[in-house]
Amino acid sequence: TGWDTCADACKIAGFVCRTAGRVALFPQLRDGADSLNSGSGDGTGLLTAGGLPKAVWQVFGLLHRLNGTLLAQGDTYIAVREGHTIRVLFCQTSANAVQTQVSVICTGLRRGRYRIRTFRLGPSCGCVSTLFQTMGAPERLSQDEQQYLRRMAQPRYHVQEQTISGQYQWTGLCSPDEILLVELSPAEIEMF
């Protein structure tokens, strides 16, 4: 029907960005997701009636990565640090119906090789309801079609490594109803 589960998932991420520090439950949600899913199997929980993860399930997977010390937060972002790893989650709701340029600037980094990973979830990547609609919204799904949706309904993932000394800046675009997690972690750090 007309229910936009990706937009709902992005609103949940926005709520977490605004309430970080007051809501301690979110890092544990994905671990206990079975208890959050509807027991009736009607698809009203985090999984579809066929057991496919909805966009909200994927959001909880990204939020689960936000362990650590809160560095900064705003209405559409949250930044945390866990050891030498820095994670910044951005969310762009459909109320802001334009692509927004977002940047992460990390300073005080030790010289070394770092791994930069991005996870992107939105209507074009990771949203099972959007994929289902583009398949033609069949009344029944074959095993192959279910496997295809399960495989494709994952956040887009990108990894790069580079040598950094002192400061690093990452810049990208966040589209409407999209959630973006940027993670900077040391691959090798010089300790002197």
Protein language model annotation of sequence segments:
Residues E139-F192:
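C-terminal beta-strand-rich structural cap/linker in extracellular carbohydrate-active enzymes
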Residues G68-L70, G126, A187-F192:
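Short, charged low-complexity linker/loop segments at the C-terminal edge of domains
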Residues T1-Q99:
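Aromatic/acidic polysaccharide-binding cleft in carbohydrate-active enzymes
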